[in-house]
Design a protein with these regions (language model features):
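Bacterial N-terminal signal peptides that target proteins for export
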Residues: 1-9
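Conserved, well-structured interaction surfaces
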Residues: 39-56, 78-152, 166-179, 185-195, ...
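Bacterial N-terminal signal peptides
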Residues: 10-17
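Bacterial Sec-type N-terminal signal peptides, specifically the leucine/valine-rich hydrophobic h-region
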Residues: 18-20, 144
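Polar, glycine-rich mid-to-C-terminal structural blocks
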Residues: 227-231, 242-334
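Hydrophobic, small-residue-rich alpha-helical packing segments that form membrane-like cores
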Residues: 160-162, 166-230, 236-263
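Membrane-proximal, proline-rich intrinsically disordered regions
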Residues: 21-64, 318-324, 330, 335
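Flexible, polar/acidic helix-loop-strand segments at domain edges
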Residues: 275-276, 331-387
Length: 387
């Protein structure tokens, strides 16, 4: 019994001793806040995480167009077809356009970044701190704009990082929402550069700034947001600021399409002189990585899955080369619907009889690339084109 009491006493003493110790292990699987905010390189790496918000618009969200009149999913049971034809009604619990949780999470992430930047602002030159704040505020405006246009401009709007445990936040008014988006984007337009200096390298020797948002991106996003807000003067003024920055169509006179198709095929690393791109999502291509677009949208004879196809509504929207509108009511146009169309048509649409990779593409029913039940081939007679 005495031995047992001694063991208990020693154990209790050891536990009390440990409670008095300052055990602060060094984490080896993540960086501390001090490291993340210690220099300009780390600051910009921290900002890189926000750019997935732009990439999302060029991923699966492209297929949201299949709920409109310009794109059609080829699989009969694809969710977009089920929603459009009412087989799967849209409800609060089943909404293909729902990004409420995602955008509110990003809203808080932006506020957290700005809060931490304010605490560590002294580590950076004022110009760098202003640039970083401008980038973060651009993305905060982007997610708030996304919430406003999908759910209405009255939601819980966090202008600062909320206090832990704080509840019952009031919803903002539409005026407060649009004013806040306006303030964030005008700040971004003021402090973002017109063009980033790609001579600046990251710690791995690569250019860090290709594809970063610019002054033009901020003005352009503001123009679009103010259209949704029905603030026509603000939208017009912002669009004029974009125009002043000297953006112009990308041109290559040596190509039949004058460079339109080439614009989307230039490697991001090529440093192409491109004055058309205002906001872009670049694809870091190398010889060991395939671009999934080729599989998901190319014709089956080319090894593709043909997940979605452009509709006749979209195809007919392309004009004739002389600027006239295309019309099936015109006997001449109807006789040769794919002759004499504008260059963008031939760079974007694969049609019956189109030349494609050294062969002629046929999309009529019964051929390899024609309509068939079950998906995997076109249901409209057309395919998207990306050379």
């Amino acid at each position: 019994m005495k031995s047992k009491n001694k063991i208990l006493a020693v154990t209790a003493f050891a536990m009390l001793s440990l409670m008095g110790c300052n055990i602060d292990p060094i984490l080896t699987d993540s960086y501390s806040e001090d490291v993340a905010w210690s220099n300009v390189d780390n600051l910009r790496l921290n900002l890189n995480g926000f750019y997935s918000l732009i990439g999302g618009y060029y991923g699966s969200e492209v297929e949201n167009d299949a709920c409109t009149d310009i794109l059609k999913m080829n699989g009969p049971r694809d969710s977009e077809n089920l929603f459009v034809f009412g087989s799967a009604p849209i409800t609060p619990a089943a909404n293909p356009f729902n990004n409420w949780d995602n955008r509110h999470t990003w809203q808080l992430s932006c506020c957290r970044f700005l809060h931490n930047l304010a605490e560590h602002r002294g580590n950076f030159p004022e110009s760098i701190a202003n640039e970083a704040e401008a980038e973060a505020r651009f993305f905060r405006a982007l997610v708030n704009f996304d919430l406003a246009k999908r759910f209405g401009a009255s939601f819980i709007l966090h202008k600062e990082l909320p206090v832990m445990g704080e509840k019952n936040h009031a919803r903002c008014t539409p005026e407060e929402c649009w004013d806040f988006i306006y303030e964030d984007l005008t700040f971004a337009a003021k402090y973002l550069p017109k063009r980033w200096d790609d001579a600046t390298k990251d710690p791995w020797g690569e250019a860090t700034h290709t594809g970063r948002v610019t002054q033009g991106a901020a003005w352009g996003m503001l123009a679009r947001a103010m259209l949704y807000a029905q603030r026509w003067k603000d939208a017009s003024d912002a669009a004029l600021e974009v125009k002043k920055l000297g953006y112009a169509l990308y041109k290559n006179p040596s190509r039949p399409d004058k460079g339109y198709g080439e614009l989307f095929m230039n490697r991001r690393s090529a440093r192409v002189d491109n004055n058309e791109s205002i906001i872009e999502c670049g694809y870091s291509y190398d010889d060991e990585m395939d671009y999934s677009f080729d599989y998901f949208y190319c014709p089956p004879s080319d090894g593709g899955y043909a997940e979605a196809s452009p509709t006749e509504d979209l195809v007919s929207a392309y004009e004739m080369a002389d600027g006239r509108e295309f019309s099936w009511s015109d006997p001449t146009m109807k006789a040769n619907p794919y002759v004499g169309r504008e260059p963008r048509f031939y760079a974007s649409i694969l049609y019956n009889g189109a030349p494609w990779k050294g062969q002629t593409l046929y999309t009529y029913e019964g051929c390899n690339d024609g309509y068939a039940l079950g998906g995997g081939t076109t249901c409209t007679g057309y395919y998207m084109r990306s050379e």
